[in-house]
């Protein structure tokens, strides 16, 4: 078996890369757990001080200025959002215009005859040119064969999102940050044809073309969608500032602003937000654990040489023939230990549970090792 110094000399590039992955994964995990802690404490603080508005006459005498409140009801839009060139007019929080252009697209197919892809010459590639609807300009100046495959340099009509100036729930206006959270877009379909004869309407899509079924390069098509139609019921949690709903800032500086469709109670809104936070946290936990796992995998040989030197850790040393299982356990333990450090000061019980879970593989293998020595 090679010595530790020899292994380091022969594997230092991959070992260094593994250390970088491990540090990145550990940092990401610590940041994610800290964010989860602060978000949970922010939700607890907001829930403890919230007032659910009932829109009664008596509430006008209650001092709600600066308080976090819960509103639930149909939204009202002051002025309609319009696209006059397409005879579109509707009362909604947002109206999104998505513009696509019919363009040339290049696809290169490599023919590898034994050389690596990086050394393959241009004469061993085949270039295909097709026409597709694209949201962004495809720069045809970079094409291998530019002759007859020229795209326009810009969009004559740009994609855009209109936001209503005044939106209300009851007598309270929704601030800009609240309106920004309306992102549940629905496709807008209309039977009213534009007055411009150069614009065709087909299956709810507007075409700037002579022939919908045979478009030419440079032709446009526009798709419209909306979010927050007037009359739809939404539940919002935020702070009242004057007559406007804005984000509530907790004592730790964490903004709380919740927007969910439907007539939901305070408990239902916070339950949905807590569930969304948990899913988001677990996604980043997986990313952090994956980085740590690959970092450990890059250093399998070095870790084995280190672990075999310590009797209580020898059982954790990755098997050189089947290292994946050992690496999974090591990454699992390290990830949970890092998460426990972030939680233990704010939620000691959760932190202690994570720490015990992280130490469980070590305790299990150590117990088996002690039992094995007793049998000897």
UniProtKB/Swiss-Prot annotation:
Q: Please report the organism this UniProt entry assigns to the protein.
A: Drosophila melanogaster (Fruit fly)
Which consequence is recorded for altering residue 333 to I? Decreased survivability past pupal stage with increased lipid droplet size in fat bodies when ubiquitously overexpressed. Females have higher rates of survival than males
Residue ranges that the UniProt entry lists as topological domain Cytoplasmic: 1-10, 299-323, 366-376
The GO biological-process annotations, alphabetized, read as: lipid metabolic process; nuclear membrane organization
Q: Which family does it belong to?
A: Belongs to the TMEM43 family.
Instruction: Give the keywords, sorted.
Output: Endoplasmic reticulum, Membrane, Nucleus, Transmembrane, Transmembrane helix
Q: Relate the protein's function as given in its record.
A: Involved in lipid metabolism and utilization.
Question: Which of the residues are on side Lumenal?
Answer: 32-277
Fetch the Pfam families from UniProt: TMEM43
Sorted alphabetically, the Gene Ontology cellular component annotations on this record are: endoplasmic reticulum membrane; nuclear envelope; nuclear inner membrane
User: In UniProt terms, what is the effect of altering residue 333 to A/T?
Assistant: No detrimental effect on development or survivability with increased lipid droplet size in fat bodies when ubiquitously overexpressed
What changes when the gene is disrupted? Answer: Viable, fertile and no developmental defects until 5 weeks of age.
Compartments where located: Endoplasmic reticulum membrane; Nucleus envelope
For this entry, the protein name equals Transmembrane protein 43 homolog
Family matches, as InterPro entries: TMEM43_fam (IPR012430)
Q: TM segments?
A: 11-31, 278-298, 324-344, 345-365
Topology in the membrane? Multi-pass membrane protein
């Amino acid at each position: 078996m090679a010595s530790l110094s020899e292994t380091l000399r022969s594997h230092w590039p991959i070992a260094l890369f593994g250390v970088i992955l491990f540090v990145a994964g550990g940092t990401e995990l610590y940041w994610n757990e800290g964010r989860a802690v602060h978000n949970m404490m922010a939700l607890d603080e907001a829930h403890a001080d919230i007032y659910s508005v009932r829109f009664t006459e008596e509430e006008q005498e209650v001092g709600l200025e600066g308080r976090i409140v819960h509103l639930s009801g149909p939204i009202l839009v002051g002025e309609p959002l319009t696209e006059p060139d397409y005879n579109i007019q509707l009362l909604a929080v947002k109206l999104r215009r998505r513009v696509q252009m019919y363009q040339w697209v290049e696809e290169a197919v490599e023919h590898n005859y034994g050389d690596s892809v990086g050394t393959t010459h241009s004469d061993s590639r085949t270039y295909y040119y097709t026409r597709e609807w694209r949201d962004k300009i495809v720069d045809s100046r970079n094409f291998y064969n530019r002759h007859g495959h020229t795209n326009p340099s810009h969009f004559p009509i740009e994609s855009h999102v209109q936001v209503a100036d005044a939106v209300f729930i009851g007598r309270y206006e929704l601030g800009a940050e609240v309106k920004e959270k309306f992102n549940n877009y629905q496709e807008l379909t209309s039977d009213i044809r534009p007055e411009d004869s150069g614009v065709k309407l087909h299956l709810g899509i507007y075409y700037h073309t002579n022939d919908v079924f045979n478009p030419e390069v440079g032709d446009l098509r526009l798709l419209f969608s909306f979010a927050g139609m007037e009359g739809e019921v939404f539940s919002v949690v935020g702070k009242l500032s004057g007559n406007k709903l804005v984000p509530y800032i907790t004592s730790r500086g964490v903004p709380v602003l919740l927007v969910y469709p439907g007539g939901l109670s305070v408990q239902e809104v916070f339950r949905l937000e807590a569930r969304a936070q948990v899913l988001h946290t677990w996604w980043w936990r997986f990313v952090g654990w994956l980085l740590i796992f690959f970092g450990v995998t890059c250093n399998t040989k070095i870790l084995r040489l280190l672990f075999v030197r310590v009797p209580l850790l020898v059982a954790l040393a990755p098997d050189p023939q089947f290292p994946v299982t050992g690496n999974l356990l090591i990454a699992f333990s390290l990830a949970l230990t890092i998460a426990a450090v972030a939680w233990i000061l704010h939620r000691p019980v959760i932190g202690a549970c994570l720490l015990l879970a992280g130490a469980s593989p070590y305790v299990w293998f150590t117990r088996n090792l002690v039992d094995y020595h007793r049998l000897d």
